[in-house]
Amino acid sequence: MNMKILVLVAVLCLVVSTHAERHSKTDMGDSPMIQERKCLPPGKPCYGATQKIPCCGVCSHNNCT
């Protein structure tokens, strides 16, 4: 009887950990806290606030600085 309980607990732990790992991998791509922030390096052309990817620094005279 005790062996059946131990096996049941071990199987449940395995199922729960596999389920949690699967969800943590899918959440990682969706989380804005984990995603790397993309920005344009200095010297690249920029167009102010209407561009999709901002400058890493400041957009000055249509160039990132």
Swiss-Prot record:
Disulfide bonds: C39-C56, C46-C59, C55-C64
Expression by tissue: Expressed by the venom gland.
One MF annotation (Gene Ontology) recorded for this entry: toxin activity
Propeptide part(s) removed at maturation, as residue ranges: 21-37
Keywords noted in UniProt: Calcium channel impairing toxin, Disulfide bond, Ion channel impairing toxin, Knottin, Neurotoxin, Secreted, Signal, Toxin, Voltage-gated calcium channel impairing toxin
One cellular component (GO) term of this entry: extracellular region
UniProt-annotated location(s): Secreted
Signal peptide (from-to): 1-20
Stated role: Reversibly blocks N-type calcium channels (Cav2.2/CACNA1B) in rat dorsal root ganglion cells. Elicits no toxic symptoms in either vertebrates or invertebrates during a period of 48 hours post-injection, when it was assayed in vivo by direct injection into mice and cockroaches.
Domain notes: The presence of a 'disulfide through disulfide knot' structurally defines this protein as a knottin.
Family affiliation: Belongs to the neurotoxin 36 family. 02 subfamily.
Protein name, as recorded: Hainantoxin-X.3
